[in-house]
Amino acid sequence: MKIIITLLLPIIFFQFAWSQKLTITQIKTNLENAPNPVAYARDVLKKQYKIDTIIVLNSTHFSGLADSLAYHGKVKKVYGPYQNKMLVQVLAKLPNTFTRISQVFIDTSIFTRRIADSLANSIVTRIQTGAASFEDMAQTYSMGGEGATKGDLGWVARGAIIPQMDKEIAKRKKGEVFKIWTKAGVHIIKKTSDAKQDTGFALILRVMI
């Protein structure tokens, strides 16, 4: 047993020393080429790592680095380092259903329900008759911050919004404008595009360097 340990020690020491001398570029290349990147980070690099599942809620507007990489990143590709201490590798991706929608939101904490409903009906009528564009109505009336994008919420993932809105949007045709009531107020929704499949989830490996 002592002989085996004695023989293994130089190998372990060499492997550790070798991993310590690798440049960032070499580490990234080795991770990308490794059959099992997790095992490589754990057993060869001897680095702390974490595996996360990232959900892409919107493929147009991203909340930060994680969902942006999850959507735009290529599988097996290693990105970074970030903050001089972390590499990020996209291990796998899975699809979800996305629909592009626009919104004019009337807040019932500001208006009574009766006034909000009357205003919403007026807005919908003006849009449907061509008296005003959805974009103009969003810039003028929306209280949810959509004025800056003329009402456009981007490509929204199924499950990213409340279930009743998800169900109603799924039933509607492209171009339809309709109202949905929630506890927050009334949402005037335009289904800008039909649903499509796109990257909705990604498995991410973070390696501390």
Predicted regions mapped to residue ranges:
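A cross-family detector of function-defining hotspots
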Residues: 57-79, 152, 158-161, 170
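Well-structured core secondary-structure elements of compact alpha/beta domains
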Residues: 20-31, 51-59, 85-129, 143-166, ...
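Short acidic-hydrophobic surface loop/beta-edge motif
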Residues: 75-84, 177-183
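Bacterial Sec-dependent N-terminal signal peptides
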Residues: 1-25
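Start-of-domain marker
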Residues: 20-74
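A cross-kingdom feature marking charged/low-complexity
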Residues: 167-193
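Loop/turn elements at helix/coil->beta-strand transitions in domains of secreted/extracellular proteins
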Residues: 130-134
